A protein has these predicted regions:
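Scaffold/interface architecture of coatomer-like assemblies
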Residues: 1-184
Length: 184
């Protein structure tokens, strides 16, 4: 991975992590990432961008056997959102805030998509003081994961995406699963 100076190559960092996890065999794979999710490509900063787009990363996540647990820590989003709600904020200031807020909101949606695509969960924290509890929740969730095997009657290995649906009858139980798999 090339070095990005002055910014965050979040997409490339996730891509490299998936490369490393691909080498791990016969084990449950999870990525726990503390991030604001803002990749340099979301900003007009003049810094070098990630080699991979979000769309490429999302497509790759759908093909990998790793669950992603983003821990979303973004003080700037919270501060800007609060300032937008302040009735004394001028219209001109509002426009500047909205421009600064846009990449944060996009990043937030993107990490939610990464978690959903991988059957993971997003944990939103306001500060570092919440991290111990969040890491404990992630560890507890990882201990409660059940794996199901599925063998399709369609044996064609054509590289196409195949949708699956998992449902349970137990009231109150939560199922998080991938939407499908790529036939290889």
């Amino acid at each position: 991975m090339k070095k990005i100076s002055g910014g965050t190559a979040f997409y490339d960092g996730m891509w490299t992590t998936l490369d490393l996890l691909r080498r791990v065999k016969d084990s449950r794979k999870a990525i726990v990432v503390l991030t604001d999710g803002v990749d340099e490509s979301l900003l007009d900063s003049g810094h070098e961008r990630s080699d991979h787009s979000f769309e490429e990363l999302l497509a790759r996540v759908s093909e990998e056997d790793a669950t992603i647990y983003p821990i979303y820590l973004n003080r700037e989003e919270a501060e800007l959102t609060s300032e937008l709600k302040d009735p004394s904020t001028t219209e001109r200031r509002r426009e500047r805030i909205e421009r600064r807020l846009k990449p944060n909101l996009t990043a937030h949606r993107q990490i939610e998509q990464l978690a959903e695509e991988s059957a993971g969960s997003v944990f939103v924290v306001a500060g570092e003081n919440e991290l111990d509890g969040i890491y404990q929740r992630v560890a507890a969730e990882l201990r409660l994961i059940y794996s199901l095997a599925y063998s399709s009657t369609n044996t064609t290995r054509d590289g196409k995406f195949r949708k699956i649906n998992v449902a349970i009858k137990q009231e109150g139980a939560v199922v998080r699963t991938r939407r499908g798999y790529v036939s290889r």
